[in-house]
Amino acid sequence: MNSSAVHTPVDPKQAHILVVEDNVSNFVLIARLLAFMGVQKCEWKTTGWGVVDFANTMSRVDLILMDLRLPHEDGYDALRQIRIDPRLQNTLVVVVTAHGSTTEMKKAREAGFDGFLTKPLDADQFPEQIRQILSGEPVWELGI
């Protein structure tokens, strides 16, 4: 999110979330956890390539959960495209990665991501992490 932008809190039950994840099992877990929270809309894209065009087909996007290691265009490349798109530039974009390290987290923060979650996701903590993110509170966690 643009550092000068103010995030308007979003109720998870009204949220429109785009998950950019190439692993079907990971997407299914995320989608089920979001559905359990009552998230209104969850869309899935398997690569960073074309993520802006895809997101612009959605009526709105409140949050993008982005894997870093993706085919064709990684999460960092996709984020750069998102940040220059007038409609999406202030959208919250949070890393969800299996490559959790302090170095990767620092790189993600410097690149302009709005948060960092590591896989495997903790099914007990994930709903609260998403609530925090949607309310405008950053979540930067390496997990276990």
Feature map (PLM): residue ranges:
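Non-catalytic signal-transmission and effector/linker regions of two-component phosphorelay proteins
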Residues: 1-18, 31, 124-144
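Conserved acidic carboxylate
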Residues: 21
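Two-component/phosphorelay signaling modules centered on CheY-like receiver
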Residues: 24-43
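The feature encodes the CheY-like receiver
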Residues: 71, 89, 101
